[in-house]
Amino acid sequence: MPHEELPSLQRPRYGSIVDDERLSAEEMDERRRQNIAYEYLCHLEEAKRWMEVCLVEELPPTTELEEGLRNGVYLAKLAKFFAPKMVSEKKIYDVEQTRYKKSGLHFRHTDNTVQWLRAMESIGLPKIFYPETTDVYDRKNIPRMIYCIHALSLYLFKLGIAPQIQDLLGKVDFTEEEISNMRKELEKYGIQMPSFSKIGGILANELSVDEAALHAAVIAINEAVEKGIAEQTVVTLRNPNAVLTLVDDNLAPEYQKELWDAKKKKEENARLKNSCISEEERDAYEELLTQAEIQGNINKVNRQAAVDHINAVIPEGDPENTLLALKKPEAQLPAVYPFAAAMYQNELFNLQKQNTMNYLAHEELLIAVEMLSAVALLNQALESNDLVSVQNQLRSPAIGLNNLDKAYVERYANTLLSVKLEVLSQGQDNLSWNEIQNCIDMVNAQIQEENDRVVAVGYINEAIDEGNPLRTLETLLLPTANISDVDPAHAQHYQDVLYHAKSQKLGDSESVSKVLWLDEIQQAVDDANVDKDRAKQWVTLVVDVNQCLEGKKSSDILSVLKSSTSNANDIIPECADKYYDALVKAKELKSERVSSDGSWLKLNLHKKYDYYYNTDSKESSWVTPESCLYKESWLTGKEIEDIIEEVTVGYIRENIWSASEELLLRFQATSSGPILREEFEARKSFLHEQEENVVKIQAFWKGYKQRKEYMHRRQTFIDNTDSIVKIQSWFRMATARKSYLSRLQYFRDHNNEIVKIQSLLRANKARDDYKTLVGSENPPLTVIRKFVYLLDQSDLDFQEELEVARLREEVVTKIRANQQLEKDLNLMDIKIGLLVKNRITLEDVISHSKKLNKKKGGEMEILNNTDNQGIKSLSKERRKTLETYQQLFYLLQTNPLYLAKLIFQMPQNKSTKFMDTVIFTLYNYASNQREEYLLLKLFKTALEEEIKSKVDQVQDIVTGNPTVIKMVVSFNRGARGQNTLRQLLAPVVKEIIDDKSLIINTNPVEVYKAWVNQLETQTGEASKLPYDVTTEQALTYPEVKNKLEASIENLRRVTDKVLNSIISSLDLLPYGLRYIAKVLKNSIHEKFPDATEDELLKIVGNLLYYRYMNPAIVAPDGFDIIDMTAGGQINSDQRRNLGSVAKVLQHAASNKLFEGENEHLSSMNNYLSETYQEFRKYFKEACNVPEPEEKFNMDKYTDLVTVSKPVIYISIEEIISTHSLLLEHQDAIAPEKNDLLSELLGSLGEVPTVESFLGEGAVDPNDPNKANTLSQLSKTEISLVLTSKYDIEDGEAIDSRSLMIKTKKLIIDVIRNQPGNTLTEILETPATAQQEVDHATDMVSRAMIDSRTPEEMKHSQSMIEDAQLPLEQKKRKIQRNLRTLEQTGHVSSENKYQDILNEIAKDIRNQRIYRKLRKAELAKLQQTLNALNKKAAFYEEQINYYDTYIKTCLDNLKRKNTRRSIKLDGKGEPKGAKRAKPVKYTAAKLHEKGVLLDIDDLQTNQFKNVTFDIIATEDVGIFDVRSKFLGVEMEKVQLNIQDLLQMQYEGVAVMKMFDKVKVNVNLLIYLLNKKFYGK
């Protein structure tokens, strides 16, 4: 290592800033910076050493580590170590760092860091520790990354995945130069050093269920460890609040010792650290063991105990016990498989024997079990003949095979299949690792041999092309070619035959390859060898026969011919003399014709090759010899064969009849036939007469022979019993093997068909089971067990739940932000309008503009910083208050009657604000199915209440402005219904606006005036027509009529388009709006049963069209139906066109005809009637919707079975406001004392203030702007996890529904691990040890999942405790619960508790529906969020537009010196500027000007005694007004010109000053402008 550890703990290199020596402030600061640099170097060294242990790889030196980690390669390798399923080596970019070393960082290196972050997310490390990608890649905050690595090490230690990181502070030494360089680096980037010592505490808080309970439990454990009593320590470890798993009472002494050592070591390190850390920076967990450290040490002890147990059971030789020991989760070993138990036992036993200590350490077991499990899976795949699985297992790095080339995996698999069959036939079950490795090596050798052979084939083809026989022979004799039977003496003939074969292949147009392959070369060599043998045979025949003839050895001719001819059977011995005579005669004739004779014989083979043989020298050749003279006196082979054949044929023909001489004699003897027939008949008659005796004789004889033969056979068997048994066993084995291989081959040949059949059968079985689950009234337990896994909450479920919660929060926040932004923009619009009237208010406009641009921030920080005193602090009192508020809002949310009554108790203006803020917030703006369902229930209850109490006649709904209807329309036209309105109306509205030629004006007077103006424009002369006319007069002009008719035609055409868009888009209408329309129709009909359907449908139309759609058509820009740019607007013609269409549709929806002043439009009345009929069908169909319970699949028990608890995001101001209103109207909405609401309000007490809600200290008491700060903080939003106080109680007071839920969860846990046909059978049958182990493993897996589960999704504490029970205890608890439920009538033992099984089946079905609805909700929320973002972007564009306008005003103002300059800091004119003089008026003068109207209790003639001094203050637009009576100053008030302008805008004409002086607001503003601004 680059830095040596010091022998013992000592102070850091640069000591503490509180050393005894006297240091100046600068020296102390320098010392502190040096200490920070040293500590950080120690943390770097700690991270480096820990990563080296995990990666088994050396990292760069400590001082270079930061730079070495920037490319993310080591981080990605670390991710592969703890999350191998997430990160593989192939996914790591530049894994060998060759590119990085060559050309430095590349942007793709960030992929490595991203993979590391995702891997940490997958194992559940809290995100509070994560660095940003740029922190690493751009080196913006490397200490943050090192901080994260430390947190990760502690978290992995808790999970038992990695060792604990070392504490090296004060144990390593760095040079002064290294420390100074690091200090400069830290100062260069200005990085705030994270607090490494607080990682344990932060991690504990982030992962806890209840921070306070966890903290207390951890402290109790530390205290118990300090006392040293092992039994007491185990009791504290068992505390459920500590959230510790796998605590074994039998290991109490080991836990005590390990935790004692760890705690003492941590305390020792803490003492060193605290010497250089200020008191404020110290953390409680610096000396205490954190929950993660405790769990890590428990895991460490458990692991060692499990390893000891494994080593103890291996020598016993029981595979089942060994398997159980290996499967224990405490052993932290890879998965093992029961079918390979014998293999684990044998292999581990052998490994243990090979070990010198006869003991296998955990690391050895880890590697061995991983490899053996991989081998087991490979054997399983081989047995199932699954080639794909075999190949996947071979590719697995866990199996650890050497020299495995992934390119040949398929070949390895096929070979292993063959070897597997062979070992199976020999009675061996599994292939061992060594056998698999040997098979891999064998295949590699074969592949290498084949590759070498391919090279040799290439050499042979090249030699053939060269035409050199010796070169060809040399290549044929290469060992790698493996060509057999090559005779070097016939090299030339090999060359000729090979060349000929290759020429033929070249000439074959269908041949793909133009070279000879190995089998073709071997065939050519074999053909050449056949030619060679034939030639030798021919030479032997010719030489032997001719030499025999020349030697006149007639007696040898037969032996010569038989030994020399190809078929000796054709030689007939009787013809020997004839053969000799014929051959001698032929040779003599041939010799007479020869004058000179040579010594060479020639043979032509296949009419292609010539073979030469010298009879004298015995040499042979495949090429023509030099000076070749043929031996023409000798008979050739063909001549000899022809002579032999001729002699043989003649002999056969000559003797054909002699062979049948005896037969001919017999035929001659048949002349005595009659005599023979008489003898035959006599014999036959005798036998017939003696038939009975003959039969007996024959039977006796046959029996005798059969018995004799049987006894002889039997004796043979007895004498050879051993041999017979062997023969029989081998025969049976061969038969069975043949049958098995035949069947196996059949399966291989029909693999695809078999897979399809199996898939079909499985699918049919699964389909039938699911139909049974869904359709059967009493689904059997066996079916339920198959689908119970669907109730598990996967990581995907949690991710989707978190995503839904995040989107809900974002949607709610965005809606509120947009609403506030819209209000501020409207106010800004007003202020700019007022600015035009009075320039002095520009400062206020600028101030409001800054408010628009100011981003919200700081509130949550203040809230979080007051955790010790605020509503979310850890004190018991605050916790109780928070829980009570959560229960209060849950009650309000789920019981709509309270809010329905409260709405009608408040004044109209106050209830509207309450609805727009608190109610919609309480229901999260219906951002999910549950809250939409509950909000609709509120709307329904409130609407029914309003109709019941406030509607006296049917038309009141139309003519009035019902509160609930207004609320429903406002909600559905907001964020949730905005997309609907856009989809429904945007296309046709945009078409109308974009049609520049479209002019719709149905006002005859306006049409007339436009026509007159057009005439004057065209002629340039004043028209003689009157300008002011009535409607009747205007209609007398044909031109006006024509234009009016054209407008009416355009109106009808355009209205049709809008109507069709509305009618065809019924499904786009929000379900909530349609349901309220249905409730409205039914409620009106219930109160007014005599109302006709037309009246009811008109009321529905008033809601759906007039209130919901009509405003959006008239003002599409105001309802965000179309996109408008800032500064852009709809012109008057476009707005008139839209208004005309809306007017026609409004008349049609209410079936109102054009009459009276609209008589000129009466031609459209038929059109209105037809349109009404279409609207009537539309309104009727719109009310045809299911009830919310059916639509959303909700009931009153839904909250008890859903995964996540409901969460709302509400401001402190809204909580206080709601609390206040509930107390104010408590007597009206909850008159009973024992009402649930009254009980909760009683628990809360008085309404808290904002400051008490946040906690004392949230705001500085001396802050002059304390009121404004508190007002701003009151808008801080907090999240409330809603819970019901009355759903689940502790102990025995649990209600039957909650008991049913708990019992179902316990039953699900039991039936997973214990088989059985009925619930009763399972509960009465004891669980086996294996089932207990499987159950414990499942519960550990669930605990790990629960540890990553967000707070709002966790189960109750009682359910967590139940889940930790062993299998048998769970069964006993189920039996107790079932007896309780049977007493309440929920279940019955007579049907074996089928009722609770039916409930579980229902939960399974509902879970699928819930997942489907959740996906739909995700899409819906995303769509809503996109629309809100677009709207926010539009508002931002308006803000920019206003900013530009204000900037222009400022620029203009600077150029005008005649007016008073305005300072943006609010201080008025610069120093030295002349201030306006005070203005003094008597009351009589002001009364004369009309400014002053009256003074209470003072007569007009006394006005002269009253004077008013108006003085401009330092602040722009602020005036002091002093009143004097008879020269004595009475009172003083302050006037704000902005307030006056606001009152003027709101239409307030008269205001009071001094509570008694009435003044005219408009004239007062005029006076101030004139006197102070020169206006």
From Swiss-Prot:
Entry keyword Phosphoprotein: yes
Assigned keywords, A-Z: Calmodulin-binding, Phosphoprotein, Repeat
Cited InterPro entries: CH_dom (IPR001715), CH_dom_sf (IPR036872), IQ_motif_EF-hand-BS (IPR000048), RasGAP_C (IPR000593), RasGAP_CS (IPR023152), RasGAP_dom (IPR001936), Rho_GTPase_activation_prot (IPR008936), WW_dom (IPR001202)
PROSITE patterns according to UniProt: CH, IQ, RAS_GTPASE_ACTIV_1, RAS_GTPASE_ACTIV_2, WW_DOMAIN_1, WW_DOMAIN_2
Protein's GO biological process: Arp2/3 complex-mediated actin nucleation; mitotic actomyosin contractile ring assembly actin filament organization; regulation of actin cytoskeleton organization; signal transduction; thrombin-activated receptor signaling pathway
One GO location term (cellular component): actin cytoskeleton
Chain positions with Phosphoserine modification: 16, 595, 599, 685, 1271, 1279, 1358, 1461
In-chain residues carrying the UniProt-annotated modification Phosphothreonine: 356, 716, 782, 881, 1002, 1269
Species, as recorded: Homo sapiens
Domain Ras-GAP: 933-1182
Positions of the Calponin-homology (CH) domain: 41-156
Expression (tissue specificity): Isoform 2 expression is enhanced in testis.
Protein name: Ras GTPase-activating-like protein IQGAP2
Pfam families on file: CH, IQ, RasGAP, RasGAP_C
Taxonomic superkingdom: Eukaryota
SMART domains in the cross-refs: CH, IQ, RasGAP
Ranges for domain IQ: 690-719, 720-749, 750-779
